Amino acid sequence: MQEDFDEQMMRRAIELARNATGRTSPNPLVGAVVVKEGRIVAEGWHRQAGTPHAEVHALNMAGELARGATVYVSLEPCAHYGRTGPCAKALVEAGVSRVVIAMTDPNPKVAGKGIQILREAGVEVVTGVLEKEAHELNEVFLKWITTGKPFVALKTAMSLDGKIATAGGESQWITNEKSRYQGHRLRDIYDGILVGINTVLQDNPGLTTRLREYQGQNPVRIVLDSQARLPLDSKLATDGAARTIVAVSAQAPASRRAALEAAGLEVLVAGTDKVDVVELMNQLGAMRITSILVEGGGRVNFSLLEAGLVDRVYAFVAPKLIGGSQALTPVEGEGFAQLAQAVELENIQTSLLDNDVMITGRVRRPECE
């Protein structure tokens, strides 16, 4: 059946798109497959912002075979001139006869215009094939392009009884090496990494990506620091390993803000007496930071959850029992007064990492019910 074949080819396009996870920001992940007479003759995916799009890679590989072919693409072909030309026009010029699209592009510069160009040129267009999977593929891009805010993922490592440290503050290491390595792989695919000032004062972290099999990329480091207390001799202020942003309140001493800037750090003011996380996310989104991995403590985590800013959670759970009424948990603060207010996850996935378990899920939104 044609419908089954279309789904099979679209699944391949989505699989190709995933090859560039973490590398295309602020662009979406896109894969394309060219099919002629029932067989794949060319494939492509968007590799990095500013480089050719998936359709162009696939068309270049197909050459003359593109004429009369069907092209499967995981996102509506673009219709505007940016750093590259419009893919919809490239498809028309290549002479393809049919284009199958997983989902329309919500980017206002596209938003149906690519489909319109194709149809006006006489190309048959089919939409909505594996649309749900295509949405999941581009969860980061969709959040950023529709709200202007980064996609926020909260990552935590805890014991089986929900502790992120002992009552005495010891936390290295609760989870095993495989879990920690998976955490570095997450750093590699997010634009930014966010912590609170207390994490910096206690641990002096580098917040860099350390991978064995390939050279990872370091995310932009973001610190919530209402009073600009970040030590000038900390790793974040001295190692030069990555762009570092310190988010302060308007009440932060001007001398401290100036000292941070003199050390080469970027200072963002968001909020009056403490950092307003919603205002901060709007600023970061405007800076084209499309995704943020949060590795903060319980108070930072709760502030983001309470503000409705968290989109995904990664929880690494070790089979250890720590106990202690004063031992810290992944979510502190005032907490939610009623169960109905609790943040619920959906689309849960689990992975076994030796004896540890990684649980991840999307935060359930009321409008999804």
Regions found by a protein language model. Give the residues of each.
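Enzymes that bind and transform nitrogen-containing heteroaromatic metabolites
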Residues: 2-27, 83, 151-152, 158-369
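A short, flexible N-terminal coil/short beta segment enriched in small residues
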Residues: 13-17, 37-44, 133-146, 235-242
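Proteins enriched for Cys/Gly/acidic motifs involved in redox and nucleic-acid/cofactor modification
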Residues: 22-26, 115, 129-157
